[in-house]
Design a protein with these regions (language model features):
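Transmembrane beta-barrel domains of Gram-negative outer membranes and organellar outer membranes
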Residues: 12-271
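Bacterial N-terminal signal peptides
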Residues: 1-7
Length: 271
């Protein structure tokens, strides 16, 4: 039998209930740090960008990002990751007001082995779909490109990287060409009782931007905990990141506060 991660086995009636509960929290913490784990999750991630220029404004993005593993063959799963962003974008012209609505939807499909070795990996296509409800909230382009994830989980660490680069393939001729890299490295250190320390900054590069203005590179740290409310497993975390490298262009932010609550649904093999 596997629960959460392939090959993870629980022995019955060998530990007190309190210890079993703590072990379950630890196992869940490791699973949520693995983007291609056999775990359905529905994260609600709120990103508050502070110091948005010009005018030292505030931008808010709520990402609804369900992750669902689907069996493909005896040896492989397809991990579907969708991000639906709900944004408030401040008006960067007159410094007052802003626009609220849905942004462009991203969808990634990772082919990942059900029983990986020490190196856990996934590879597949990434799509950026022009679902924005206002032109200032999206690109107006259909974009596609490759995506890859790789990680290792030596106790008590989880260390990995997730990256994709999408290119616009068609869309409005009056909209800018899309050629952008998203790269997220993640390092987590697991503590007792489901607690963990984490750093998972999101680095981006807009290859169409002027020279010297392409990269946004944040650094920061956060903490989180896996816990249960009734029978529902949850993962909550808070992180803060400083954009040490950022373009000197309208819309660039100085800081980001990230608050996330994930609903977790561990998969169990049916007998």
């Amino acid at each position: 039998m596997w629960v959460l991660l392939p090959g993870l086995v629980f022995a019955a009636d060998t530990k007190p209930p309190a210890e079993e509960g703590q072990d379950h929290q630890q196992d869940l913490a490791k699973a949520v740090q693995n983007p291609v784990a056999a775990l359905i999750s529905v994260p609600l991630q709120d990103n508050v960008d502070l110091g948005v220029e010009p005018g030292d404004r505030v931008r808010n993005t709520l990402n609804i990002q369900p992750v669902v593993p689907l069996p493909l063959t005896r040896d492989f799963n397809v991990i579907t990751r969708v991000i639906l962003p709900i944004l408030y974008q401040p008006d960067l012209g007159d410094g007052e007001g802003g626009t609220f609505g849905l942004g462009d939807t991203s969808a990634t499909f990772f082919l990942a082995p059900k029983k990986p070795g020490a190196l856990i990996w996934g590879i597949g296509p990434a799509f950026l779909l022009p679902t924005a409800t206002n032109e200032v909230l999206g690109t107006g382009k259909w974009s596609v490109g490759p995506s890859v994830v790789a990680l290792i989980q030596p106790e008590p660490w989880s260390i990995g990287v997730l990256a994709n680069n999408v290119f616009s393939v068609f869309g409005g001729d009056d909209r800018a060409t899309v050629n952008q890299l998203l790269l997220q490295y993640f390092v987590s250190y697991n503590l007792p009782k489901g607690w963990y320390l984490t750093s998972a900054p999101l680095l981006t590069a807009n290859w169409e931007a002027p020279s010297g203005e392409k990269w946004t590179v944040p650094f920061g740290l956060g903490a989180g905990k896996v816990f249960t409310v009734g029978k529902q497993a949850l993962n909550g975390s808070v992180s803060a990141y400083y954009n040490a490298i950022r373009p000197d262009l309208p819309g660039a932010a100085e800081w980001q506060l990230r608050i996330q609550l994930s609903f977790l649904f561990p998969l169990k093999k049916k007998h």
